[in-house]
Amino acid sequence: MAREQDYYTLMSGMQQLDLQGKAVPSDLVLIGEHAFPLAMNPRGQVLMAASHYGRGRIVVLGHEEYLTRFPGLIENAIMWLMPCTGDAGVVGIQKSLRTVAENLNYSPFKTELGDFQDRFAIYITDAYSVESSAKDLIAFLKAGGGLIIAGQAWSWSYEHPQENTIRNFPGNKVCSVAGIYFSELEGEVGTFPVPRNIPSSWLAVAIGKDFKEDLEFLLEGVSEFDTQGGAIASEVMVHGPLAFPIAVTPNGKTFIAGAYYGQGRVIVVSHEGYMGRDSLSSFMINAIKWLDEGRKGVVGIVPNLTAAHTVLSKSGLDCQLTGFREDLSVYVCTSYSDAQCAEIQEFVAEGGGLLIGGHAWYWAQTHCGSNVMTEYPGNHILNKMGLCLLGNTLGGGLYKAPEIEHSCKHGYHFRSMLQRFAQHVSQGQELTDREQGCLKQLGTDCASYLQMRCHDSAAYTSVVALLSDIVKEVGVPQVCSNCPVESPKDHLMLHIGTEVYKVTPDPDALLPYIIKDRPNLPTLSNARVRITANTGGCEEWISTGLYLSPGMKTYIAVPPEIVGKNWQVQLGCQTDNIGGSNTLKRAPVVHARFPLDSEMVQVWNLWGGLIYLIAPSQTKVDGVEIVVQNAVQAPYFKSGETSVADWVSHIRQAPAPWAELEFENLIMTFDSAFIRNLDRPDEVAKLWDTIMRTITDLAARPPKLPRKERFVADVQISYGFMHAGYPIMMHSGSAPGLVNVEEAYKCGLWGAIHELGHNQQRGVWEFPPHTTECTCNLWSLYVHEQVFGIKSANAHPAITPADRQARTKMYFDGGKDLNSWCMWMALETYMQLQEKFGWDAFKKVFSLYHDMTGVPNDNAGKMNLYAQTFSKVVNLNLSPFFKAWGWPIQPNTEQNLSHLPAWSDHPVSQYA
C-alpha cells in the first residue's frame, strides 16, 4: 500500500512523540482517499497528517511548535516531499519560522527564509499567514511542490465565533484541497508511541463538523420534500466525515445529502428529476445558494436539465445551460457520466460548488455482477467526497423536512453509528433503543462501504481494521437451522463478518471467528472436468461434482477457448438472498462468482460450496477441460455417465455436504444426507425424465429442454414454500420427496411441478396478477394425470368437486368481480376448458403463441387475443363462455368469432 510506505518514510527512526507541554494542537479532520494520519492520540484525535494533491505532497502539523520540537520529523518530511521536484531544490521557510531554518543548518537541505516563491521545491509555513497566497500555494502543490503547514484553529475559532472554521480558517484555505482540515477542537496531548503502521482507532471514526448551520440555511422555508410521482430514486450513502444527510425517508434512507470537499461543497440528489420540480424549488434555490457561497457567480447547468434550469433561475443567480467550465461558481449535472471526473473533483476541491442528480438502481439492474460503489459513473465523482449512490430503489412520498436539532444530535450517520457500535463492543456501553433500531442500516452501510475496496485509502483501511477487530472481539453468530439469527446485533455481526472477510488483507486470520466448526474433509488434487455447453438466450450452470470447504482456496486452470469470454466460476448453489428476513438460518448471501479472465484463476468463498462453471448465453464449447488444483469430491450422479454400481459402492459416500443428481432435463441439489442411502438413482432419473418430457409435451416444446431445470433445497429461501426461477428453490424438508419414487406415484408432487409450471409461463398468454398462481397449475394437473394417474379431483385438496362448486358459486354470487378471479378461481376457468376440449387444445394454443407477434401489452387486449386463439383452435365461439366469467370481451372479438358456432351450453351458462 502506497500510503503505508509514505508513513514509514515520514516516521522513520521515531519511537515516540512527546507532545506534552503548553502547546495545545488542533484535532485534524481527514477526508478523501489520499490523507492519512501521522500522529493520533488515545482519543482518536489526529494531531499530524499528510496527503497528496495533484503531483505534490503536504504535511500538516496540529501546532506550529511541532516544527521545532520534532526536527527529525521535519527532516523526514522534507525528504518525503523532495522527490516530487528533485533533491536539489530549495526549501523555502516563512520569515517568522527562523528557528526551523536554524535547525536545518546542519542538514543537507538548502534553505531560504522569506515569502513564498514558486521556484521553491518545498515551502514551510504556519497556518495563519497563508490566506493571501492560498491560490499560489495550491497551484504550487498541484504542480508537484511540497508543503509543510503547522498551526491550530481552536483559538482562531474562539476569536471568530460566527465563522465556519472548516471553511474560513486561513490554513484550511490551502490544506483542505488535500483533504486535511484544522478543526476548532482542541487535541489532547501526552507522550504517544509511534506505531509501525498508520495509526487508526475506532474513536477516529467520527463526524468532523456540526452541520447545524448548514441545515438551517438549506432548510430555510422548507417544511417538506414532495417526491411523489413516478420518479424512482436511489438511496444515498453518507460516509465521509464532512458529509451529512439532508432529506431522509421515515425509515432512515437518505435521498438528498451534502458534503464539504476541499474548499468547495457538493449536494447529491438521488434523482435528476427532483432538481426541476416546482414542489422542491424552495430547497433547490437554497441548495444552489449554499453551493455558490455568496460569490454570485455563474451556475452552469448541463443542457439536458432544462427543467432544473427553470427552477434554479428563480434563485436570481446567473444560470446558464452549458457544459463544464472552470470559470463556473456552481456546476449542475447528472450522475450518469464521469467524462470529466478529475476536472470536476478539482473544481470542487478548489472552491467550486457541485449539484449532481441521478439514481444508480437502473445501472445496477443492467450491470448485474458489477460493483455499484466502484463502477457506477457518478460514484467515481462522489466517493472521494464522502457520498455515494446505492443500487437500491426508493419510492416517492411526501416527507417532512428534518427537525434540525434532532437531526444533528440523533440523526443516523454511518460514521457516528459505527463509532457507537465500536464503543458498545469495546467498552460495553449500552445502545439506546434508537441505536438498536439503526443496526440493520449500519450493517447494510458497512457492506456498501467495504465494497469500495479502496485499499490505498487510510480512511478505508482503518474501517476495515476496525471491523476486523470487532469481529475478533464479538465473534460471528454460528447461524444454522438450530441456531437462527434473530437479534439486530447478531444480524449486524453476521453481515459484517461476511463482508469484511472479502476485503481484509488476512482473511485466514478472521475465518476462525466467523466459522468455528470447519470439518477437515479429504481433498482431490488436480481434478479434471470436461465442459460441454450449447447455451441459448440464458446463462447456464455446469456442474463439476466438486466442492470447496468454507474459506478453502484453490486454483483453476482454464482452457484458452473460454478465457475472457464471459465465463465465470460460481461457488455455492444457494443463490437466494435472504437478507430481508427477520430470522436467518444461514447467512443472507452464501455464493460467490469469479470471472474466468486468465488461464489460472484463484477462487474461494467464505461459506464454501459446490463448484460450477457459468456458461454465458449464446455459447458453444465441446469437451474443453478445466483442472481444479484442490477440491472435495461431492456425491454426483449423472444419467448416462454414472453407473448405479459405482454410485452405491462409493460415489454416494463422497465427503462433500452437498450432492447433485443430474438427469436428462433436470438437476437436483440438496444436502448429501438425503441421498446417502439412495440405492436406485436410476429409478429417480426415470421418474423425472418422464415428468419433464410430460411438461415439455404440454408446452408444445421439444422433449429436450435447451437448458436443464434446477432444484436446490436449502435450509431457508427468500420467499414462499418454494419459488420458481433458475434454480427453483425449495426448503430442505421437501428434498426427500423428490427422490421417493413410490411416494410420488401414490401422492403426487404438486408443489415441485407447480414451480416447473411457473417456469413454463409466458407473458403473451399470462394476465398478471390474476393468472400468476393459476396457469402454472395446468402442468401440475397434466403431470398428475398423465404420469401418476391421479385425476384432478384427487390431485390437490383445493380442487375437489365440492370445493370447485362452492368457489364458483361464491364468485358469481359476488358479481363475478375480475379482481377476485385469481389462483384457484382462475384455474376453474381453465379446468372447464380442459374438461370440454382436452389437453390437445392447450398444446395447440401454446404452439400458436410460440411465434406470435403483435401481442398486446395490456391484460384486456391479451385476454381478447386468448379468447380468439382458443376459439379458433376448437372451432367454437368461446366469447359467451369468457364473458360469463367476467372477461372484458370486446365487440370486435365477438364480431371476429361470429362465424363460428357459439359454445352456449358451457358450465357457467346459468350465470351468463
Curated annotation (Swiss-Prot):
Q: Where is the Peptidase M60 domain?
A: 539-838
Q: Read off the Pfam families from this record.
A: M60-like_N (PF17291), Peptidase_M60 (PF13402)
The domain of life for this entry's organism is Eukaryota
- Cite a single GO MF annotation: transmembrane transporter binding
Q: What is one cellular component GO term in this UniProt entry? A: plasma membrane
- InterPro entries listed in its UniProt record: Class_I_gatase-like (IPR029062), M60-like_N (IPR035423), Pep_M60_3 (IPR042279), Peptidase_M60_dom (IPR031161), TCAF (IPR051244)
Read off the Gene3D superfamilies from this record: Peptidase M60, enhancin-like domain 2, Peptidase M60, enhancin-like domain 3
Function (record text): May play a role in the regulation of the cation channel TRPM8 activity.
Family that this chain belongs to: Belongs to the TCAF family.
Name of the featured protein: TRPM8 channel-associated factor homolog
Please name the source species. Answer: Danio rerio (Zebrafish)
Source gene? tcaf
